[in-house]
């Protein structure tokens, strides 16, 4: 074979580019060795966000060669932690397991207390999404979906804030099914409003399946309804709202809209504008962790199952909800239902 100068030059250029890419990746990996990475947690101690953050941290340490510290900043339905993460340097040393649902809905309803635009966070991966389950005071009047749908007095639900996942799910459910409801906000955490339900101060609450299961398995609260099209894998005996009643098209729209938001789930994010090389590495190692059979087994054993989601898919859902696909009249209706209708 005869090598012409131009061919040799091209081969050298390609080889150089490959070497440079490898060197760049190695340099990014080396950057993390000995560094401190802060994984911000906005949930209360013992909450699902707290547990997921603490399970994820040692796996990230192993992959990055860094020390990963879970930094708790609870408050304001996790928006305190969201605001904090928003203003951190985009140097790859700060991440947060964020409440994607609440963050998107807060933007949708024009919450002016927010300093951030969720669509501009650096999306790393979805860590988990899970159906929400209505759990109730076991000595109360609600034993089935039928009991709830036929209630003559307001169903009383405890929660943290108006877009904390509990209140907004409740509001859209009550609006869809045309039942009287009263949402009491102001509890500091899910543990507090779950305790209120255990005491009978409210009829119940709505939590993601892993949190709901902890209360149901101990007999403190009873699961009556899954707010999704599919049953919970952790609470398989609890029926879904969809299988329990024939829904009108309008009712199905409200429940499906909330389900679409739910798919965003708990997402690992960084501050806006993260350096591409560090972002690529963080996305790579996070995907490796969340698809590793040993990691998945460990998470599941603690009833905190992981369900990896591609960052591009999550960004697509966010942009669809906050973009122009939702007519303005419908957006205003959603805002009214979430922010005003049941308080």
Residue map of PLM features:
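Bacterial N-terminal signal peptides that target proteins for export
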Residues: 1-11
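A glycine-rich, hydrophobic loop/mini-helix early in the fold
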Residues: 14
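N-terminal signal peptide c-region/cleavage motif recognized by signal peptidases
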Residues: 20-22
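Conserved hydrophobic/amphipathic secondary-structure segments
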Residues: 26-265, 331-343
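An extracytoplasmic/periplasmic, membrane-proximal ligand-sensing/linker region
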Residues: 33-37, 276-343
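Structural beta->alpha junctions
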Residues: 44-45, 271-275
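A short beta-strand structural signal in non-transmembrane regions
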Residues: 265-271
């Amino acid at each position: 074979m005869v090598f012409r100068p131009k061919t040799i030059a091209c081969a050298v250029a390609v080889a150089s580019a490959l070497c440079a890419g490898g060197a760049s990746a190695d340099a990014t990996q080396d950057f993390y060795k000995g560094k401190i990475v802060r994984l911000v947690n906005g949930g209360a101690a013992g909450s699902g966000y707290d547990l997921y953050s603490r399970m994820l941290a040692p796996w990230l340490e192993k992959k990055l060669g860094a020390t990963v510290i879970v930094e708790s900043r609870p408050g304001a339905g996790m928006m305190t932690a969201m605001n904090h993460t928003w203003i951190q340097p985009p140097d790859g040393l700060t991440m947060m397991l964020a409440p994607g649902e609440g963050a998107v809905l807060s933007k949708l309803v024009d919450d002016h207390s927010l300093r951030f635009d969720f669509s501009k966070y650096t999306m790393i991966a979805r860590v988990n999404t899970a159906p929400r389950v209505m759990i109730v005071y076991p000595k109360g009047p609600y034993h089935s979906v039928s009991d709830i749908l036929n209630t003559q007095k307001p169903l009383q639900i405890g929660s943290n804030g108006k877009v904390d996942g509990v209140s907004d799910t409740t509001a859209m459910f009550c609006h869809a099914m045309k039942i009287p409801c009263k949402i009491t906000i102001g509890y500091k955490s899910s543990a507090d409003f779950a305790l209120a339900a255990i005491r009978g101060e409210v009829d119940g609450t709505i939590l993601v399946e892993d949190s709901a299961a902890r209360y149901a398995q101990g007999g403190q609260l009873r699961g009556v309804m899954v707010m999704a099209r599919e049953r919970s894998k952790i609470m398989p005996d609890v029926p879904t709202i969809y299988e329990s009643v024939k829904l009108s098209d309008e009712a199905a729209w409200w429940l499906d809209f909330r389900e679409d938001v739910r798919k965003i789930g708990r997402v690992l994010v960084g501050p806006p504008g993260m350096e591409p090389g560090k972002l690529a590495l963080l996305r790579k190692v996070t995907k490796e962790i969340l698809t590793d059979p040993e990691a998945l087994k460990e998470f599941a054993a603690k009833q905190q199952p992981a369900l990896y989601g591609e960052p591009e898919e999550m960004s697509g859902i966010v942009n669809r909800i906050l973009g122009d696909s939702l007519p303005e009249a419908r957006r205003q209706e959603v805002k009214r239902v979430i922010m005003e209708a049941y308080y």
